[in-house]
Amino acid sequence: MAENLNYAYTGVPYDKDNYTSDSISWCYNNDASNCAKYGRLYTWAAAMDSVGTWTINGKGCGFRNECSPTYPVRGVCPEGWHLPSETEWDSLRTAVGGGAIAGKMLKSTSGWDDFNGEHINCTDAYAFSVLPAGFRVYEGSFKDEGLHAHFWSSTEYELEGAYYAYYTLWYSYLDKASLYNSYKYSGLSVRCVKD
């Protein structure tokens, strides 16, 4: 998928720990124009389809719940697509020359500026078109639009599986793309992979 997912849950019966069907994905700064530009930002539970609306592969996966998903996890992705695992993200980084240059190779040629507002030269050599969508912090604020891109994986972080999952981070000011872990309540972008 060459763009971030922009699917809003509507009518999904989900209510856990103050997260309802209206608060499991967001537009950056709650501005609909940012969804059109960057796609939505999802909690890990939403990305995994923890309520099992479409498939049971990610059912029960969410904050404070360790899970053993059945791979591939369709999650919130359209039929015939799935949420990439940590291994799939790492394979993508390797395929384009390694993590040290993956950011430069896969980031969009526009939208990336450094801290001084100077344009960053990215090649988007594989038409993957990563945009700096930023993320939603678990307590509700939004950060890093124009500076970073964060994408969920379907893989829990092994040391804190109930609370954290792996994601990829793309920097405006560096050529690399890195794998880290994030709090599952955070709002990150989603890219889907064709089955």
Show where each model-derived region lies.
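Conserved positions within compact, well-structured domain cores
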Residues: M1-D195
